[in-house]
């Protein structure tokens, strides 16, 4: 049976992650408060950030930047701004 969480990003109850995907206290906070759907949305933004900003995950500063963006996106409701990206126009 799926584990439900009260997702702070979606502001509703939704299926939670199957296991802790991120280390440490932040990982526990994500596991307890973020749904699979919200995590999937973050992964899309994360991929775009890494590619567009040419982040190197071996670089501590780049990892710290990405972690702060993740916190802003998942817990503070801030949208990730990616230079040059224009979302598709819906008809």
Swiss-Prot record:
What GO molecular function terms would the record report?
A: iron ion binding
**InterPro entries documented for this protein:** Fe_traffick_prot_YggX, Fe_traffick_prot_YggX_sf
* Alphabetized Pfam families for the sequence: Iron_traffic
Its Gene Ontology biological processes?
cellular response to oxidative stress
Q: Keywords of this protein's UniProt record, alphabetized?
A: Iron
One GO cellular component term noted in the UniProt record for this chain: cytosol
Organism domain of life:
Bacteria
**Is the Iron keyword given for this protein?**
yes
Q: Which SUPFAM superfamilies match?
A: YggX-like
Q: Give the function comment from the record.
A: Could be a mediator in iron transactions between iron acquisition and iron-requiring processes, such as synthesis and/or repair of Fe-S clusters in biosynthetic enzymes.
Task: Name the family.
Answer: Belongs to the Fe(2+)-trafficking protein family.
User: Do you know which NCBIfam families this protein is assigned to?
Assistant: PRK05408.1
Listed name of the protein? Probable Fe(2+)-trafficking protein
